[in-house]
């Protein structure tokens, strides 16, 4: 922390924090440091990754906890944990070697865009793949923590399995 402070002290002395955060110009060679594009880019990547990941994880957690046999969950849990243990550098390398060329070769031309593939979309897709194991584990544990009596009560009152999931399980979980 001390080294970081020493290296950035001149920057903090010459510019206000407001100017650093909200300036759109990034030219380090000429002494212009604007963090705004990086902040906005990070927000976009995060929002898109959550948009991609949320439905996949929610539907997978519902399927695994409500429709499949317990053996499927016992097999899937270690696999999900292994995916969660993969270093982010490996995911990033996979993104550069697979996702970026895919976007450049197929998605760009599909939409009439000439691109190298290095984009917010590529970053969001890689981030969404990275966070799937964590969100999926959380949702599975939430659904498993709901008392079985609630599900059985809804089913005994004549609700279908989907009605039970929609009206009881999801409302209790979320």
Predicted regions and their residues:
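Glycine/proline-centered hinge or cleavage motifs at structural transition points of membrane proteins
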Residues: 87, 157-158
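Individual transmembrane alpha-helix segments
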Residues: 31-49
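Transmembrane alpha-helices
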Residues: 78, 82, 135-139, 146, ...
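Membrane-interfacial helix termini and adjacent extracytoplasmic/periplasmic loops
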Residues: 6, 13-33, 92-129
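Transmembrane helix boundary and interhelical loop/hinge segments in multi-pass membrane proteins
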Residues: 56, 68-71, 138-152, 161-163
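Transmembrane-helix boundary motif in ABC transporter permease subunits
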Residues: 49-80
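Hydrophobic alpha-helical membrane-insertion segments
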Residues: 1-7, 81-92
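Hydrophobic transmembrane alpha-helices
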Residues: 79-86, 99, 125-135
């Amino acid at each position: 922390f001390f080294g970081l402070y020493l290296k950035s002290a001149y920057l903090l002395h010459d510019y206000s924090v407001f100017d650093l955060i909200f300036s759109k110009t990034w030219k380090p060679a000429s002494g212009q440091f604007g963090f705004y594009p990086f902040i906005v880019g990070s927000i976009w990547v995060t929002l898109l990754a959550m948009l991609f990941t949320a439905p996949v994880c929610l539907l997978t957690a519902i399927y695994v906890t409500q429709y499949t046999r317990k053996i499927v969950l016992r097999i899937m849990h270690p696999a999900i944990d292994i995916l969660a243990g993969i270093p982010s550098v490996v995911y990033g390398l996979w993104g550069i070697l697979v996702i970026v060329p895919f976007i450049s070769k197929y998605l760009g031309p599909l939409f009439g865009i000439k691109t190298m593939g290095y984009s917010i979309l590529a970053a969001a897709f890689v981030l969404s793949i990275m966070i799937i194991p964590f969100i999926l584990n959380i949702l599975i544990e939430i659904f498993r923590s709901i008392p079985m009596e609630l599900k059985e009560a809804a089913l005994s009152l004549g609700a279908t399995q989907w009605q039970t999931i929609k009206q009881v399980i999801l409302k209790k979980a979320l």
